[in-house]
Amino acid sequence: MAGHSKWANTKHRKERADHKKGKIFSRTIKELISAVKMGGPDPKSNARLRMIIQKAKDQNIPNENIERNLKKASSADQKNYEEVTYELYGFGGVGIIVEAMTDNKNRTASDMRVAVNKRGGALVEPGSVLYNFSRKGACYVPKHSIDEASLLTHMIDCGGEDLDSDDEEFFLVLCEPTDLASVKEALLAKGVTCSEERLIYVPLRLVDCDEETGKSNLALIEWLENINDVDDVYHNMA
């Protein structure tokens, strides 16, 4: 899964988990702004906005933050956000996928080039890395809310395909992208807490690296994750 490697120590994983939580909040706010730009600021008539506001509340984003960004989104000066995907090869044949949501694609592309110049790797043509990954739906279930055995039983009953427990904070219930909404609703009906649901990339095979190569890849991945516009970085390093 994204962000997990045997070359990352416990402190490193904790720092990255905290960083990822901040990225999740940031992406939700960008999704909120995008929803307003596309469908207007009234959640009663904008179903997508209504869904994202609920997601923000589920993530414990303060109401004042939500209201402030609703006003911000209604401003003519606020640009809309676009989703962009970049593909890279790191060291030792490791594939990397970067997902970003940006209001300035030129800025994001420049930041990606800087990352490669500073930390190595190579940006490649679309499709060059994606074939090593599968697109999946994922429901994020807090680990403190349920034990793994119970969730596994619920997952099977609800139409999920697999349960990933690698994340420090969440179980990920995986399913086909087209089944994500129905799997989430079925889990909620069984009393399972779903903090977030989204589409992710899952590696089809993992690439083994020696220690030096692994650490070089982690340095590149960290740099990519710290780009402001970047929301997710996926890799297939073991």
Swiss-Prot record:
Compartments, as annotated in UniProt: Cytoplasm
Source taxon at top rank: Bacteria
InterPro entries: Integrase-like_N, TACO1_YebC-like_2nd/3rd_dom, TACO1_YebC_N, Transcrip_reg_TACO1-like, Transcrip_reg_TACO1-like_dom3, YebC-like
Record's GO cellular component terms: cytosol
Pfam families hit by this protein: TACO1_YebC_N (PF20772), Transcrip_reg (PF01709)
Record family assignment: Belongs to the TACO1 family.
Record protein name field: Probable transcriptional regulatory protein CT_457
Originating organism: Chlamydia trachomatis serovar D (strain ATCC VR-885 / DSM 19411 / UW-3/Cx)
